[in-house]
C-alpha cells in the first residue's frame, strides 16, 4: 500500500500564496483538511479549491464568535452538508467573551452529537475542562484535539473518550509532548501543520515529513490512522 502524507489542520485561506500552496499539496499528494475561520469562507473555498487532496472544513474560530454574531446562522445553514468541521472550539486566553464562545460551541455540539459522519477539529487553549464538559461522553462524531496544550489529567480523560490528537512540528520538540506520548494511544495520532501559525521556517511537506518520521520511529503509523479516521 502506498503511504501518503496528510494534514488534518491547515489554513489555506491564510496562506500568502494560495495557488502555490495548492500546487504543493497536489504535487506531493498531501491529503489535507483545510480549516475555515468563518462560515462564509467555507462555501467560497468549496467552490474554488475543493478537490481530491483538499477537504474543506466548515469553521468559526472561537475568538471570532463575538465579533461576527450575524454569521452564526450561516454556520447552521451549511452544517448539514459539511463532513469536516473546524476550526471550532474555545479559547480562554482572554475570557472576556467566554460566554459567547460557550453558547456557540454548546449549540454546535448539540447539533452534531448524533452525526457519526462528522469529523471535528477542536481548538481548546485554556478551556480543556469546558470542552470536556460540553462534549460529554455520549457522542457519535469524531473529535480531533488540535495542538493540545492542557493538563495530563485532562489528557487521560480525553484518551479514555476516544479523541484523536493532531500533532505538529512545534509540539514534538517539547518535554510535554514526550509525557503525552506515554498516554495517547498509537492509533489516535494524526499529522497537522496548523500552517501558517507554526513558527518553523520549513515547507509544508518538510514539516509533515519531520513529524511523520518522528512518530514512525515510535512505531506509530499515522497514514493508517488517517485512513481509519476518514473511513477509507
Predicted regions and their residues:
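Mid-domain alpha/beta scaffold segments of enzyme catalytic cores
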Residues: 1-232
Amino acid at each position: 500500500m502506498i503511504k501518503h502524507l496528510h494534514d488534518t489542520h491547515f489554513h489555506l485561506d491564510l496562506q500568502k500564496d494560495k495557488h502555490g500552496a495548492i500546487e504543493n499539496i497536489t504535487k506531493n499528494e498531501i491529503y489535507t483538511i483545510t480549516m475555515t475561520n468563518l462560515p462564509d469562507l467555507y462555501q467560497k473555498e468549496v467552490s474554488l479549491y475543493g478537490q481530491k487532496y483538499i477537504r474543506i472544513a466548515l469553521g468559526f474560530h472561537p475568538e471570532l464568535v463575538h465579533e461576527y454574531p450575524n454569521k452564526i446562522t450561516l454556520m447552521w445553514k451549511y452544517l448539514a452538508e459539511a463532513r469536516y468541521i473546524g476550526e471550532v472550539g474555545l479559547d480562554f486566553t482572554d475570557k472576556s467573551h467566554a460566554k459567547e464562545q460557550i453558547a456557540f460551541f454548546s449549540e454546535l455540539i448539540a447539533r452534531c452529537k448524533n452525526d457519526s459522519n462528522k469529523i471535528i477539529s477542536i481548538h481548546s487553549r485554556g478551556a480543556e475542562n469546558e470542552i470536556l464538559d460540553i462534549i460529554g461522553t455520549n457522542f457519535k462524531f469524531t473529535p480531533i484535539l488540535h495542538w493540545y496544550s492542557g493538563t495530563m489529567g485532562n489528557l487521560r480523560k480525553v484518551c479514555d473518550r476516544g479523541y484523536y490528537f493532531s500533532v505538529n512540528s512545534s509540539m514534538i520538540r517539547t518535554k510535554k509532548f514526550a509525557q503525552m506520548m506515554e498516554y495517547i494511544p498509537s492509533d489516535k495520532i494524526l499529522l497537522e501543520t496548523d500552517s501558517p501559525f507554526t513558527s518553523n521556517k520549513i515547507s509544508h511537506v518538510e514539516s509533515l515529513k519531520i513529524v511523520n518520521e518522528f512518530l514512525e520511529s515510535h512505531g506509530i503509523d499515522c497514514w493508517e490512522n488517517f485512513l481509519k479516521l476518514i473511513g477509507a
